[in-house]
Each structure stands twice: as structure tokens, then as C-alpha cells.
Design a protein with these regions (language model features):
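Alpha-helical transmembrane segments of integral membrane proteins
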Residues: 2-38, 82-224
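Membrane-water interface segments at transmembrane-helix boundaries in multipass membrane proteins
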Residues: 43-108
Length: 224
């Protein structure tokens, strides 16, 4: 029972991390490079992402896109083996609800890190050498700005575990989060302990991957 629930929760977390990494880093890079009106729009979106609770956002998404427009399923998670398209559609709303606040955090961290890197002396040297701005940003500045972003992603991954408890219950997804709530309500201590062990293992693995990513991105922090 726990293994099948773990697969569902990991699917939700991995999908959310992918969305947060792509959208959050992308918006942060755009905001640091362009500024102006675009920066204000992205700032507004980030404030909204931080201000809106994920359970409220989940209810609004279900009411709008599932109940009113019937675009996405309201509840549950379709098995990938039965329908890959249905599986993907059933992930969209819970991932959006879970990713809104982390996207805002990653975007702000990326923007600040990129702004600091783009003011560095080596960036002026690269510009003087004739490299295009796109090449400077994507190949050099982003890599140097990625270390603090990876740190934030590691912290957010741990906080996402708490978010899954709420989102899984809002969308009736059969994962570890909804199982934990049911077990607490039923005073089922062995199941609660099992869920806690799985969550602890996830945190340990996440920290391990963050350390590995640090070593890949910066040779200075590699353990000899």
C-alpha cells in the first residue's frame, strides 16, 4: 500500500519540480535581462504566487477548469498505463496548485543571482570579446547563478512534501499525503510511522542530490 502511494506522491513532486525549474528559472532570467514593464508584470505574478494559499488555488482551479469548463478532471490521478493523455491531464491542476508559490521563490532567487552575476567583471570581458548577449546569459551567467538556485530548490523540495498533504486531499489523489491524513483521523499509528519514514528518506535523498548538483556545477565544492 505504501509503495503504490509513494509512487503517486513522487510523480506529483517530480512533475512540480520540473515545472518550477523551467518556469521559475525562465522568468527569473527574463526579469534580470529585460527589466522595465516585463519586470513589473513578473513581479506582480510572483507576489500573487506567494500570497495565494495552495488549497484555495486548488479549489479555484477545480471550480473553473474542471466543473465549469470541463477541461481537466476534478479529482483523482489517472494511471499512466491506462491513458497517458488522461494521466497528464489529471496532473495539470494539482501541479499548478503546488507549483505557484515555489515558482515565485525560484524566480526571485534566479533574478537576484543573475543580476549580481551580470554585473561582474568577467561578463564585461565576455561582451568585449564579441559574444552575443544570448550566449553570455545562457552559457556563462546562468551557470554561475545556478548555485543559490539549486540551494533554494533543495529547500523547496522538502517543503513540497507538506504541500502534497494539502493538494492530495483537495484533488483526492491517492498519495502519501492523503494516506497520512486518513491514518491520523483513524488513529492508525503504524501507517503514520510508515509515512514519516518515507518522508524522511525523501528528504535525505533530496539533500544528497543537492550536494551532487553542487559538485557538478562548481568544482570548488567537490569533495576529494
Amino acid at each position: 500500500m505504501l509503495n503504490s502511494r509513494l509512487t503517486v506522491t513522487l510523480t506529483l513532486i517530480v512533475a512540480t519540480v520540473i515545472v518550477v525549474s523551467i518556469v521559475g528559472v525562465g522568468l527569473g532570467v527574463v526579469s534580470s535581462v529585460r527589466g522595465g514593464f516585463m519586470n513589473r508584470i513578473i513581479d506582480l505574478l510572483s507576489w500573487l504566487g506567494l500570497a495565494v494559499p495552495n488549497f484555495w488555488l486548488g479549489l479555484v482551479l477545480v471550480s473553473t477548469f474542471a466543473v465549469t469548463f470541463h477541461v481537466f478532471p476534478a479529482l483523482g490521478l489517472t494511471a499512466f498505463s491506462s491513458s497517458p493523455v488522461g494521466w497528464l491531464k489529471s496532473l495539470v491542476l494539482p501541479v499548478i496548485a503546488l507549483a505557484a508559490a515555489p515558482i515565485a521563490v525560484v524566480m526571485r532567487q534566479t533574478r537576484d543571482a543573475m543580476s549580481n552575476v551580470l554585473e561582474g567583471e568577467f561578463i564585461r570581458t565576455l561582451r568585449a570579446s564579441g559574444l552575443t548577449e544570448r550566449s553570455i546569459v545562457m552559457r556563462h551567467a546562468l551557470k554561475n547563478a545556478s548555485l543559490p538556485v539549486v540551494s533554494v530548490l533543495g529547500v523547496l523540495l522538502v517543503s513540497l512534501l507538506g504541500g502534497t498533504v494539502i493538494v492530495e486531499n483537495v484533488f483526492a489523489i491517492p498519495g502519501l499525503g492523503s494516506l497520512a491524513v486518513s491514518a491520523v483521523s483513524a488513529h492508525d499509528l503504524p501507517v503514520v510511522e510508515g509515512v514519516a519514514v518515507y518522508f524522511t528518506l525523501i528528504v535525505i535523498v533530496v539533500n544528497l542530490f543537492v550536494d551532487i548538483a553542487y559538485g557538478l556545477l562548481s568544482p570548488k565544492v567537490r569533495v576529494r
